[in-house]
From Swiss-Prot:
GO terms for biological process: protein unfolding; proteolysis involved in protein catabolic process. Transmembrane segments: none annotated. Signal peptide: none annotated. It comes from the Bacteria. This is ATP-dependent protease ATPase subunit HslU. The gene is hslU. Belongs to the ClpX chaperone family. HslU subfamily. ATPase subunit of a proteasome-like degradation complex; this subunit has chaperone activity. The binding of ATP and its subsequent hydrolysis by HslU are essential for unfolding of protein substrates subsequently hydrolyzed by HslV. HslU recognizes the N-terminal part of its protein substrates and unfolds these before they are guided to HslV for hydrolysis. It comes from Nitratidesulfovibrio vulgaris (strain DP4).
Amino acid sequence: MSTLTPREIVSELDRFVVGQEKAKRMVAVAMRNRWRRQRLEPSLRDEVAPKNIIMMGPTGVGKTEIARRLARLCGAPFIKVEATKYTEVGYVGRDVESMVRDLMEIGVSLIRDEEATRVRARAEAAAEERLLDLLLPQSPADGGETRQSTRDKLRGLWRQGHLDDREVDMEVEESTKGPQMDIFAMPGMESMGNQFRDLMGKAFPARRKMRKMKLREAWNLLVDEEASRLLDQDKVVDIARERVEQTGIIFIDELDKVASGEGTHRTTDISREGVQRDLLPIVEGSVVNTKYGMVRTDHILFIAAGAFHFSKPSDLIPELQGRFPLRVELDALGRDEFYRILTEPHNALTRQYAALLATEGVTVSFTDDGLREIAAFAEEVNEETENIGARRLYTMMERILADISFDAPDRPGEHVTVDAAYVRTHLEDVRVDKDLSRYIL
């Protein structure tokens, strides 16, 4: 588990998300409390439940990005789900327990990758020997010293990269599609479907076939196979289950859409309340059956988010409200924040587009007045049409750089400066025609 202090967590989040200090501080404390909990006596540790969070704010202000970056920072299994995708038990659709099953799948994949990295050196050594066997098959006529000498020469050529494009015949698993199990897509039967597929996989193991491929591709497959052999799959599952139960994060987006606020009909209120009641035991802490065994949700951190334009957290059922004790409102973004988003983050849009076009030999630079003009346009369009927050910058940048992106292969070595005049030239028609801005931006 990460030992970063709340201040260090906020500092790391600042590299990717502009503003929203209150939200950053709240999630940083929530993560630090997990570290603190692990240092308690076992008898008290189980009593300390995570303080789940509701983030309120319009779209495009950083709700999802804060949660996603937090999970990466802490190495925690993370999944983003949408509350509207689930239905209450008895109706066609996914049941809420499937989010825990999906989180467990992500946890297993995360641990498998970590363990594969740990044994990669051994896997590469074994894969290299198998690769040389493909290049130099065993022959009774070969002398021991002659064969070893040839093998060493091939090893040297391979390590120098001279054999990457040579083709070999290699036996690989045949990827066969299993029978469609649509019957198990019914509510409450997903777990049974997973168990049935596992049973079918054991009863009918995958067939192998010979395939011609380049040596570099064969090398990658052999490394994966050897790493898989070196891994203790039971250990991987045990570690993953522990990681999911103790550090897992489930981000539930659009929670406001299942709240019974103003303008909702009685029939939809009933359906929405059903989803909330199904969510309740998962958030409170229960045991969910997965293909990897039982997973407890008592200490999984739930971060919910929503715009809450037509409803408010108090419209949720009281029991669910009580399970989200922490609430924070994220600020809407204006031109100052848009300017900072274009310049400050480690993965700023301007850096992304400049790097993409640099692959074609085209150098793109942005002046300060050009960036401020983009920010002003984004704020203006958001005010006059739908406010989609920072996502507006994507559409603005695409329109501004559309011509150069199309012509880049024919203009290597060229330098393009995006200043205020360049921005106005490419966006002025949209500003003049307000109806056009609704469709283009």
